[in-house]
């Protein structure tokens, strides 16, 4: 049996913390869209750090048995998207994150977003 959305979210947040991801926020998408229950947005310090963070998250999700994992952006590591079903993870380099500003689009005023940590 694979983990539910809350278990998947906890696993992702723990791994992001262990991997020293920065400025991690969680956006509650329930009732807003059918793409997932949660969105996690975080930053890595460099291309290499973004790739390493994403790799560690993927390994943990695979070990936990999360089905249907999809990943985009790994070769370049400016922005890596991990679709874990009910939880979507975006790992950015800081400049790319500032440019796309997903937090503003999905959680205006950050009322629906919470900082991890």
Sequence positions of predicted segments:
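Long, contiguous binding/interaction regions
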Residues: 1-31, 45-52, 59, 64, ...
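A short, glycine/Asx- and small/polar-enriched loop/turn
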Residues: 33-37, 83-86
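Short hydrophobic/aromatic beta-strand micro-patches
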Residues: 41-43
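Basic, polyanion-binding surface patches
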Residues: 67
């Amino acid at each position: 049996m694979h983990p539910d959305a809350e278990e998947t979210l906890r696993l992702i947040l723990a791994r992001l913390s262990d991997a020293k991801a920065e400025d991690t926020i969680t956006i509650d998408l329930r009732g807003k869209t059918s793409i997932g229950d949660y969105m996690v947005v975080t930053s890595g310090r460099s291309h290499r750090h973004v790739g390493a963070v994403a790799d560690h998250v993927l390994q943990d999700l695979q070990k936990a048995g999360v089905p249907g994992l999809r990943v985009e952006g790994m070769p370049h590591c400016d922005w890596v998207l991990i679709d874990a079903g009910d939880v979507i993870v975006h790992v950015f380099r800081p400049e790319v994150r500032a440019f796309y500003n997903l937090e503003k689009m999905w959680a205006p005023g950050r009322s629906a977003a919470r900082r991890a940590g």
